[in-house]
Amino acid sequence: MRLWKSMAWGILLWHSQSGALCPAWPPARAAEEITRLQQQLADWNDIYWKQGVSAVDDSVYDQLSARLVQWQRCVGQDVSSTPVSPPLNGTTMHPVAHTGVRKLADRQAVEQWMRGRSELWVQPKVDGVAVTLVYQNGKLTRAISRGNGLQGEDWTPKIRLIPSIPQTTQGALANAVLQGEIFLQREGHIQQRMGGMNARSKAAGMLMRQDNASALNSLGIFIWAWPDGPANMPERLSQLAKAGFSLTKKYSLAVKDASEVERARQSWLTSALPFVTDGVVIRMAKEPASQYWRPGQGDWLAAWKYPPVAQVAQVSAIQFSVGKSGKITVVASLVPVILDDKRVQRVNIGSVKRWEAWDIAPGDQILVSLAGQGIPRLDEVVWRSRERSKPVPPDSHFNSLTCFYASETCQEQFISRLVWLGSRSALGLDGMGEASWRALHQTHRFEHIFSWLALTSAQIANTPGFAKGKSEQIWRQFNLARRQPFTRWIMAMDIPLTQAALQASGDRSWEQLLMRTEQHWRQLPATGERRAGRVIDWRDNPQIKTLSRWLAAQHIPGFGS
């Protein structure tokens, strides 16, 4: 598949500002796009926290929230109003504020953060809903949603119905404030293989709905903070385990460097766990007194998240490619994203009809993942830009019998045919990729797909961009091609037969091929009535006949008299 020459680029140009990619929008459009995305996130957020229903995948919501913040920073807008936390409906104050956790981008950032810090521990970053548990005189008296970190909703009635959360405590925990994650319990969850499964939304939904008390049995608790608890981490973990919060001790490891953090992170990513995770949290055993905890100021802990299985990517352009058979394929160019260490900047949408059904235009946000063999795959459109500037696809008059000869309208299918004939399925011209064919064609103006046979070594050497070694290699490859058997040349001419069928036919010359009837073709392996008819149409095509005579003049095996 080759890129259509008159491909339409979107109006989105990009520049760097403070290390981020910013859309070069006019001020009015920037304000409109930011407002629309902000409102959509707010609507999703409201549904999520009020009704317990997830209208969008957790990962998509998180990535679009980050995209909104990026856009706001690009235009110098205040980001404090971004709806990345639950709407503040509750008025119950947290005894100790939730600080949140700083995100570290990679191992280098982890190493830098760990430098100068001691008594460090790593825990899985459990994907659920944050909560404060308050125990007084040995009894659970209050449970408060995270809210804005300072105050949230009173969840006490629901939390009392969750069997996995201890309702009574003893000793130091008899009067304590705990912070943790309410999560959807899983059996043998392998994060790398199973992904997030919208576990956060499901847990939130169970807590929000009024008619599903039995569903609360499937929720668990992972305590990640005991403000003003024992200074010694092993002692803290031991007391939590004795009180019924056993997961914290089981999944807390002392670490000395980033290598140990990385090993734990990889182990938890690939091992069976009782919960969904989205990374790891590194924390110091020594914490400030709880009176100093403030939202956004927890510098004694940091998170190293897993890369998402799918990334939200912005469409920068829509391109069209025409294959050797004349099929038009639509490709979306993307502002590059990283998926599993792979830089993804293009994704195949499919046919023009499929593109029209997807309704994708430059500026849209799409969800991209990696399919088999690391091929980028379009999963869904998660956000559409207000401006719908779409390119016009090329005419659909191309087919399997067009563009054996070069013309202005045939450029892309013609190049596709050259790439095909140079592939291992045809003549096997090593080192001849699309760029080399384009350079030769643009310089020497091929008349047809075999015009390269008439090039001299001097002409090849004078092709712009060809070094001496490359031009000599191409010259050798072109000469070796002349010795290829007849069947290889027929494949290069794109006969509509498989190699197995062509070998079974026994034809070793053009003269033999001309004598074959449709009945003969129909009897070959994987060749029915329809394909046999296509072979006859191909053989009788005027351009194919002319090419066969030209190959005969070049003394190609099987084409001479």
Curated annotation (Swiss-Prot):
One of its GO terms (biological process) is DNA repair. Keywords: DNA damage, DNA repair, DNA replication, Ligase, NAD. PROSITE patterns: DNA_LIGASE_N1 (PS01055), DNA_LIGASE_N2 (PS01056). InterPro entries: DNA_ligase_AS (IPR018239), DNA_ligase_B (IPR020923), DNA_ligase_CS (IPR033136), DNAligase_adenylation (IPR013839), DNAligase_N (IPR013840), NA-bd_OB-fold (IPR012340), NAD_dep_DNA_ligaseB (IPR050326), NAD_DNA_ligase_OB (IPR004150). One of its GO terms (molecular function) is DNA ligase (NAD+) activity. The active site is at K125. Its EC number is 6.5.1.2. It catalyses: NAD(+) + (deoxyribonucleotide)n-3'-hydroxyl + 5'-phospho-(deoxyribonucleotide)m = (deoxyribonucleotide)n+m + AMP + beta-nicotinamide D-nucleotide. Pfam families: DNA_ligase_aden (PF01653), DNA_ligase_OB (PF03120). NCBIfam families: PRK08097.1. Belongs to the NAD-dependent DNA ligase family. LigB subfamily. HAMAP family: DNA_ligase_B. Catalyzes the formation of phosphodiester linkages between 5'-phosphoryl and 3'-hydroxyl groups in double-stranded DNA using NAD as a coenzyme and as the energy source for the reaction. This is DNA ligase B.
